[in-house]
Amino acid sequence: MFGLPIPIIGLLIAVFVLVFLVLRTRVHAFIAMLIAASIAGLVGGMSADETLNSITKGFGGTLGSIGIVIGLGVMMGSVLEVSGAAEKMAYSFIKMLGQKKEEWALAITGYVVSIPIFVDSAFVILYPVAKALAKNGKRSLLTLGVALAGGLAVTHHTVPPTPGPLGVAGLFGVDIGAMLLTGMCMAFLPVVGIVLYAKWLDKKYPNFNQEVFTEEELKQKYDSYIESREKKELPSLGLSLLPIVLPIVLIFIKAVVHLFVKDVPEALTSIPYQIVSFLGHPVIVLALSVLISVYTLLPKADKNTTALHLEEGVKTAGIILLVTGAGGALGAVLRDSGAGKQLAEQIANLPISPILIPFIVSTLVRFIQGSGTVAMITAASISSPILAQIPGVNMLLAAQAATMGSLFFGYFNDSLFWVVNRMMGINDVKKQMVVWSVPTTIAWGIGGISVILANLIFGNDGSVFDLLFPVVVLASILFYIKLQNKNL
């Protein structure tokens, strides 16, 4: 068939079937991935037993490395959600930055809160804050809502312990701590881009606000609102941030210490280093965070109530664990069948950098079926066996490329598209795309450019021509949207 090796033919058929099942049938992504893995193995020349062994090995191996972390992460997120810690962060950041900077405060809140809390739930919890501020401070609800959603969405797609990035880290075999720290850095500029776009929306739709007040009335309403929020029974800012900041600090300390002692064998076996390494492991830091959040944020909750909150969090992670494991199964089959190695040999001769493969695959899957988590897991499961065979590829940046690609053009098949637009009362399709499809694409473009630039600096396989893909696609979509909405 077109002179292609059998394993590559198996991969192509598997990808086609996967896309068809997810897009055109009611088959869930988990089952679709298992079917695709089976096809890739059987058509690619593996026996039935070899295929099944590869699937089970890949499934178990992937969940073995990140399953515990996902479970602990969603437990912590559940406690932060029900305790009011997310609201406390929002009110505190708003007070710190002051009036007229609420969009930045909400974006920062989203940036932090979405690390442990699922993005849809976080927006539902925090949107009333944006709505109240718009009503009491003559701020555009579009600006505040989009800024909040943008901060939430970017870190949700790029920073562990959110399940998607965790799964990607496991599939690429990169350190979760490194993924967390790199993801937080990479997420910064896309969030800034969304906030600037959100501020532009105020000029685009100036009549979206409610009543008009004098400056004195605005100040009184704003001060009164902040004061009323401060009287609400919420945990302190320090306690609200502690479960999120603690893992970051411990992981950072471990990374710095390892950097200094990695070439000293005696230091690596010393008791102090072992303690730092133990406390900086993602499983340990998240377990500590869950314990701290339970005893500091839910001090009055009884045993049964606390257990209920934690179990509710775990329920949300079930299907994500299955999809992540299925992605690992598909990746294992591609490695064992030889498809990854053979495709790597073909790609090595193409005029593109390997780092673009997970970015492009994630972008396409996101556009086709809408789920950012499925997009990045699919991209990682397909591309990681390929990139592992190409010398010099920075797998950490490849993992980030897969997560950034999953931000592309959120629209009708993206659940957050409907959450954001429905809660803001936007029913016109063109306006819905302006409000959410465009900012997610801006974040995608900035994120993709950031990864490519980082690869030019820290990798050895990059090219400035890699920038053409995100730049041209982003410019084309923005130009099209501008034409469609020039009369709105």
UniProtKB/Swiss-Prot annotation:
The keyword Nucleotide-binding does not apply. GO terms for cellular component: plasma membrane. InterPro entries: Glcn_transporter. Signal peptide: none annotated. Its main location: membrane. GO terms for molecular function: gluconate transmembrane transporter activity. Keywords: Cell inner membrane, Cell membrane, Membrane, Transmembrane, Transmembrane helix, Transport. The keyword Cell inner membrane applies. Belongs to the GntP permease family. This is Uncharacterized permease HI_1015. It is a multi-pass membrane protein. It is found in: Cell inner membrane. It comes from the Bacteria. The chain crosses the membrane at residues 2-22, 27-47, 59-79, 106-126, 176-196, 241-261, 275-295, 314-334, 347-367, 368-388, 438-458, 461-481.
